[in-house]
Amino acid sequence: MHEQLSPRDQALEARLVELETRLSFQEQALNELSEALADARLTGARNAELIRHLLDDLGKVRSTLFADAADEPPPPHY
């Protein structure tokens, strides 16, 4: 039949269960953080692409408004 565990073995088993529980929670947290990081990277890539398009459009508008760079007003610090 089952042998009764000594107090030392019971303490070790309790510590092992606690460590396994902590590891499980840490693995879950790591997976959640990994997913959040992947989402953030995707959002960053989308935003970078959007900014590139906006800058492109701004350049086109600017070139339409100021066909010659000499016609463009000087920057505010002049």
Curated annotation (Swiss-Prot):
Gene3D superfamilies assigned: 1.20.5.300
Record-given protein name: Protein SlyX homolog
Residue ranges of the TM segments: none
PANTHER family tied to this protein: PROTEIN SLYX (PTHR36508:SF1)
NCBIfam families linked: PRK00846.1
Gene name as annotated: slyX
Taxonomic source organism: Xanthomonas oryzae pv. oryzae (strain KACC10331 / KXO85)
N-terminal signal peptide: none
Stated family: Belongs to the SlyX family.
